[in-house]
């Protein structure tokens, strides 16, 4: 017997039904699922409650939470129009007013409604600020309400770039806001403990779910084999075995276990398959001038091995790299010179065929867009660059042809675009089969069912502030920041004494005073100088959108570097401690001889740093990459090989205990 209930916003509390399952061969009692709805009516079937997502007054298999996700997904695909299927294969950027990137505090709901209701898109990256978790949660609820109001009520998958560390860079990561603040993934690699990585990712998972995020565009399984590459601080370093272990722990924590997705999971999209870190000349392939990863040797396997950690943890998503694998070969055969999102060998033959990946392949952002004119050459002086496309290797194809080539290569979903009509026309013109779209749509919808979105798309915004950035979680994050410090040199300076007079550069005076130090104004008055700096960089591509934001070029301290000048000044007068934020492997040859103590950090607050300097505990972290002795040595390195620098100043795995 079926009865119909009016739509409401309340949660249906769990209760135990005593009637047999309608579709199950087992005549056992079943616990009522918890349901959230703002738009869909509820129906009762034999004493159980379900959401009538398509509003036909019947319980359809895809609405039946008792059935397995694969069966529900197959039923839903069978009910969808071609337009709706094409929309599922888009992964848009949730729009905000006045921002091309989607930054801000509130969504542009009119623009979002167009994407959801007219283009049938139901996956979005959010770049909303995390400064107000409750507001962020309610904004994501508003997207879900728009999605629930559509013909089939397919919920939105909301994704994010990493937002729990010190780095913030558009297209890479988001400012931390109120979320727990940890060291960069390099710091987790420096600690080297897979269980700590799992705990970190598990905490991030809970924070994400609290604000309505169910997909993480992370981690990076890329090897940082080219030390000038701007994306190194999002990796786990240059060692394949260490990276594999870290990736496995990350995916396990993010997905709430090693056995695939469940109702508490956040989908982990591991990136960037494969070889991204072998960046030619250190340039990044977000930019036309950096489209190549250079393989001078047949070393692709080094870069594949870290991804096997993701496969062992049953990662649900993979994102291909923008890069063209220049000169790369596989068992002696050359690899097609197109970006990985267009490369059938890399996606279908290697990823799915040889390594058995059966999840969703989500393209990196804007691979089907054009890159012409100033996208190739940079804008003229005085003009502001804007993001374009990254269609590397297929620049001469039309956008429609790029979509077709990517789908045939193995892509399931397209990042950063919502032009679903292109896929519709390709099917109508006989250039793609609808059955091929069904395969991708089925994969994507199955994950929505697995993560519980059809039953509970909304979150309790009132609880978000209590969950995000919880005090005990931040205490663990602070402990992790401290443990990630790598002691490179210590000539009888550590531990520092409370009450010491300190001259500071790059460190907050209030934090030093709270840690028990006496702050002085000139080095001559100090017992010790404490200096914070970061890996040097250049910005030779300020006329490119991403190039203007990337830290590129030389890793060495020049004489005119203000931080280096502070080191020279202080070390001539007083024992000097220097800590370097290692976003890339710095050349420290002209720094190490001027310091009594030298510490590598991968993201640490002033207060955590200062209290660690007082502590007498041993330092246990190790470098996740080698530190070259000179830029000449860097230029001689093979971009695709790990730890091949000539006579590195500090080798991979180096770290003093005290």
Model-derived regions: residue spans:
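Short acidic, glycine/serine/threonine-rich loops at helix termini
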Residues: 167-173, 227-232, 278-285, 328-333, ...
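Short beta-alpha connecting loops at secondary-structure transitions
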Residues: 289-295, 330-336, 378-394, 399-411, ...
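Binuclear metal-dependent hydrolase catalytic cores centered on His/Asp/Glu-rich metal-binding motifs
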Residues: 273, 280-300
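Short glycine/threonine-rich loop-to-helix capping motif typified by GTGT followed
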Residues: 233-235, 329-344, 375, 471, ...
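N-terminal signal peptide c-region/cleavage motif recognized by signal peptidases
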Residues: 24-25
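N-terminal beta-rich core of secreted/periplasmic extracellular enzymes
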Residues: 32-274, 302-319, 336-416, 428, ...
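Bacterial N-terminal signal peptides that target proteins for export
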Residues: 2-15
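C-terminal non-catalytic regions of proteins with extracellular/luminal or membrane-system context
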Residues: 29-47, 53, 210, 367-371, ...
């Amino acid at each position: 017997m079926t009865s119909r209930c009016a739509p409401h916003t309340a949660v249906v509390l769990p209760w135990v039904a005593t009637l047999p399952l309608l579709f199950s061969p087992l005549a056992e009692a079943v616990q009522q699922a918890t349901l959230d709805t703002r738009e869909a009516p509820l129906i009762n079937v034999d004493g159980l409650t379900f959401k009538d997502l398509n509003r036909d007054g019947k319980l359809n298999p895809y609405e039946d939470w008792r059935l397995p996700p694969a069966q529900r997904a197959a039923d839903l695909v069978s009910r969808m129009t071609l337009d709706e299927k094409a929309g599922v294969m888009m992964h848009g950027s949730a729009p905000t007013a006045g921002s091309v990137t989607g930054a801000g505090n509130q969504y542009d709901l009119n623009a979002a409604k167009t994407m959801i209701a007219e283009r049938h898109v139901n996956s979005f990256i959010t770049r909303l600020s995390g400064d107000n978790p409750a507001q962020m949660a309610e904004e994501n609820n508003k997207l879900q309400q728009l999605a629930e109001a559509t013909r089939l009520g397919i919920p939105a998958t909301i994704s994010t770039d990493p937002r729990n560390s010190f780095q913030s860079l558009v297209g890479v990561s988001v400012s931390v806001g109120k979320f727990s603040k940890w060291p960069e993934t390099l710091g987790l690699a420096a600690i080297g403990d897979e269980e700590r990585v799992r705990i970190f990712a598990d905490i991030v998972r809970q924070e994400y779910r609290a604000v309505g995020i169910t997909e993480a565009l992370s981690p990076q399984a890329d090897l940082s084999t080219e030390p000038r590459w701007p994306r190194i601080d999002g990796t786990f370093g240059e060692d394949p075995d260490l990276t594999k272990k870290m990736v496995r722990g990350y995916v396990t924590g993010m997905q709430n276990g090693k056995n695939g997705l469940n109702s508490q999971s956040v989908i982990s999209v591991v990136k960037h398959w494969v070889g991204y870190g072998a960046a030619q000349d250190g340039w990044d392939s977000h930019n036309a001038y950096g489209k190549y990863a250079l393989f001078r040797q047949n070393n692709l396997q080094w870069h594949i091995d870290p991804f096997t950690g993701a496969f062992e943890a049953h990662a649900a998503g993979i994102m291909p790299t923008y890069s063209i694998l220049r000169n790369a070969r596989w068992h002696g055969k050359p690899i097609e010179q197109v970006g990985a999102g267009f490369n059938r060998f890399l996606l279908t033959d290697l990823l799915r065929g040889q390594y058995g990946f059966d999840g969703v392949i989500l393209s990196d952002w804007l691979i089907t867009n054009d890159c012409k004119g100033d996208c190739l050459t940079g804008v003229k002086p005085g003009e502001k660059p804007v993001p374009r496309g990254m269609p590397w290797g297929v620049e001469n194809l039309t956008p429609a042809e790029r979509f077709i080539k990517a789908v045939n290569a193995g892509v399931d979903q397209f990042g950063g675009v919502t032009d679903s009509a292109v896929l519709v026309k390709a099917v109508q013109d006989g250039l793609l089969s609808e059955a091929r779209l069904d395969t991708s749509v089925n994969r994507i919808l199955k994950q929505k069912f697995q993560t519980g979105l059809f039953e509970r798309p909304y979150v309790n915004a009132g609880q978000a502030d209590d969950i995000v950035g919880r005090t005990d979680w931040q205490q663990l994050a602070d402990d992790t920041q401290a443990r990630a410090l790598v002691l490179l040199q210590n000539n009888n300076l550590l531990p520092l004494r409370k009450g010491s007079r300190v001259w500071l550069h790059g460190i907050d005076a209030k934090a030093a005073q709270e840690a028990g130090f006496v702050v002085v104004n000139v080095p001559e008055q100090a017992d010790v100088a404490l200096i914070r700096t970061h890996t040097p960089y250049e910005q030779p591509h300020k006329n490119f959108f991403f190039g203007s934001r990337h830290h590129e070029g030389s890793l060495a301290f020049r004489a005119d570097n203000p931080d280096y000048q502070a080191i020279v000044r202080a070390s001539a007068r007083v024992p000097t401690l220097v800590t370097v934020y290692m976003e890339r492997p710095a050349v420290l040859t002209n720094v190490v001889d001027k310091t009594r103590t030298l510490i590598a950090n991968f993201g640490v607050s002033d207060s955590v740093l200062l209290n660690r300097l007082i502590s007498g505990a041993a330092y246990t972290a190790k470098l996740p990459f080698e530190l070259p002795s000179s830029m000449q040595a860097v230029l001689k390195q093979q971009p695709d090989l790990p730890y091949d620098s000539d006579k590195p100043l500090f080798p991979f795995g180096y770290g003093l205990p005290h």
